[in-house]
Amino acid sequence: MAKRIIYNENARRALEKGIDILAESVAVTLGPKGRNVVLEKKFGAPQIINDGVTIAKEIELEDHIENTGVALIRQAASKTNDAAGDGTTTATVLAHAMVKAGLRNVAAGANAITLKKGIDKASDFLVAEIKDKANPISDSNAIAQVGTISAGNDEEVGRMIADAMDKVGKEGVISLEEGKSMTTELEVTEGMRFDKGYISPYFATDTERMEAVLDEPYILLTDKKIGLVQDLVPVLEQIARTGKPLLIIAEDIEKEALATLVVNRLRGVLNVAAVKAPGFGDRRKAMLEDMAVLTNGQLITEDAGLKLENAKIEMLGTARRVTINKDTTTIVAEGNEVAVQARCEQIKKQMDETESTYDKEKLQERLAKLAGGVAVVKVGAATETEMKDKKLRLEDAINATKAAVEEGIVPGGGTTLAHLAPALEQWAASTLSGEELIGANIVAAALTAPLMRIAENAGVNGAVVAENVKAKSFNEGYNAANGDYVDMLAAGIVDPAKVTRSGLQNAASIAGMVLTTECIVADLPEKKEAAPAGGGMGGGDFDY
């Protein structure tokens, strides 16, 4: 494949073009008065969305080079989404502002490497400041406020997530399901989540979200390695007759057996997914036994004289729903409260008897997993399109509340970053010099970009609002929903510190990468040769 190579200013300008396109399409969703974006789908109804990272994932440009710019800034959004689960639009707007200002300086002759050093130092300073300014979160009222803001000012959602956290605890699992009614409901069921994902991505049932969702599956639990597919055949045949999905949780599955499962899954013979059992040694066995109690099944282990090849369908556990992604597996079970309760009592007894603090800690973890249960939010909406939008908002809100519990909250609405700009300028002026100082000032100038965009989306002059906010105390900011300046914490307009921090770090990282780009190598678009004119028989587009 022939390549085209672009150097220096041309390379950076082409990247900038792609970044401009993506940033603009994502930035329109920012703030309480942000608009929606409609995504055309090849199949099914278009999707109406207010979620930065989902929009970013959809954008593909015709020009390869510009598309590289899109991919770079998409990475800032995705990384922020992975770390904090929210704040993707803010990260995109920040990265865009830093790149714009940085490229102006590079074009004027500044050294890109030194600028990047300045940007990195400024980023480290700001991360420390955000940590310092964060307020720890304590009551469910504050949790509700975080959820409300993240779900796009939907108070009902915020309240619901706060209730869910009250019921399952801060470490508890909150999972989303598509409900059957018009209203969004919350229920708490038994269930557990553990930190192992699917063994092969081919098990994913939803390829867009890379998740495997199994409804009412049978669950096969074993503490041995599955090496030969022959061991599994008797069970697989019994399950294929029932037409229900199967989840296999085993110590490991060797290549041959795994390949057979994947082929069956892809051909649609059997809806199956396989996960490695969590933990090691005796602890792995204990956790598998916990799962057996939870799902009302048996652990197939040779210690109990049970062999895989003799397993009957009655020995398998069942669950209402299992959701598996690349990192975690969530089992939502129901109907065996008594057995689960008895198992919890047994674990508590072991905790009282053990001397080792390490064992106590691990037993406590098992108890929390088993007793905490799973809060299931059933998303209700009038149409499929609204349901998808609501589900994305809820997901953001759940992630944001978890991030807030971890690292505390800061004033929201772009306020924190805007207030940190003067502090950064002062610090940079006293500690940095030359082009490093210019790099730090690029970051300082970009810090007001999210606030300005929120104001502009609400139909006001962003620059004026930013200057007004800077002149006020740290907690005061601009409430775009009704257009006045308020104490953000008191008004409940808050962001998780983790979201603000991740967005800033990822934006600075991507900006540094773009500024230090000196050359791009991309595929040359292939020239399509004109088809010869069809003459008589055999010509045209027909097969004879």
UniProtKB/Swiss-Prot annotation:
The lineage of its organism: Bacteria, Bacillati, Cyanobacteriota, Cyanophyceae, Synechococcales. ATP binds at residues 29-32, 86-90, 413, 479-481, 495. It catalyses: ATP + H2O + a folded polypeptide = ADP + phosphate + an unfolded polypeptide. It is an enzyme of class 5 (isomerase). The keyword DNA-binding does not apply. Keywords: ATP-binding, Chaperone, Cytoplasm, Isomerase, Nucleotide-binding. GO terms for molecular function: ATP binding; ATP-dependent protein folding chaperone; isomerase activity; unfolded protein binding. Its main location: cytoplasm. This is Chaperonin GroEL 2. The gene is groEL2. GO terms for biological process: protein refolding. Forms a cylinder of 14 subunits composed of two heptameric rings stacked back-to-back. Interacts with the co-chaperonin GroES. Pfam families: Cpn60_TCP1. PANTHER family: 60 KDA HEAT SHOCK PROTEIN, MITOCHONDRIAL (PTHR45633). It comes from Synechococcus sp. (strain WH7803). HAMAP family: CH60. Its EC number is 5.6.1.7. Belongs to the chaperonin (HSP60) family. Together with its co-chaperonin GroES, plays an essential role in assisting protein folding. The GroEL-GroES system forms a nano-cage that allows encapsulation of the non-native substrate proteins and provides a physical environment optimized to promote and accelerate protein folding. One of its GO terms (cellular component) is cytoplasm.
